[in-house]
């Protein structure tokens, strides 16, 4: 297993979308009260005094939708100001991104991932949820993507969750975005966290099937740059951008895992695919437990992580019953 140096941080469990695979509008979700969410000060304390001393140097801000946090710019500035931080990125649905992109860039953010599950506004509307404004959302998301590209975010990555019978017919169109643009499209296998009923009904498509479609159309070569995350990177010959495939269902990448996840209410989770070994850091911090003690607890969990990842992995892929949605975990 790789050295664990990457923390995904959910800033908020709320979102302005209700995507089918994450927090469907058919579910009656109970969102956290504002007082239950880590404050910016608490979060920066944990990053500075607990995680960085343990070797964490790369951080990603997620949600829910992180741009719903009114203090998002302060959080970005605070993390960037820590000298040990090597990388800060964000994952967003881009609905609120266009007016914020320049400010985020000036605050120090350089890398951004944007969820874009369809290029067809009607299909996109079906995926993001039923409300009176849903048909207008694709245009705002696309404007946010264009603005981020214009401002200079690099790399700019587009995350695509493929759902059988919903958007699987768009694989080639989405892959084609990388040909003339220095964009990076990442296909993510649909998994049961968030909507187990839809998962059981629709199933999922292995990454290799998507690669075969793309390979048959254009050819496919190994990407020139391979990250240290879970994505297998490829490239259409001559394309400016790359294609990534995150295959948590079909191709175990536990040996490459380098991350933990911190929920908006301060629960530290060592593995996405199961709920073993979670630590409640927020309650401990508010109860006056020292950051030295919290650091020791996280260190012990880091030592257990390989066993949790390998031995408990199947509990998250077959018959799993998750108590938290993807929006609560932080993706």
From Swiss-Prot:
Binds 2 [4Fe-4S] clusters. Binds 1 [4Fe-4S] cluster coordinated with 3 cysteines and an exchangeable S-adenosyl-L-methionine and 1 [4Fe-4S] cluster coordinated with 3 cysteines and the GTP-derived substrate. Disulfide bonds: none annotated. The keyword Cell membrane does not apply. Pathway: Cofactor biosynthesis; molybdopterin biosynthesis. Monomer and homodimer. NCBIfam families: moaA (TIGR02666). This is GTP 3',8-cyclase. It comes from Acaryochloris marina (strain MBIC 11017). The gene is moaA.
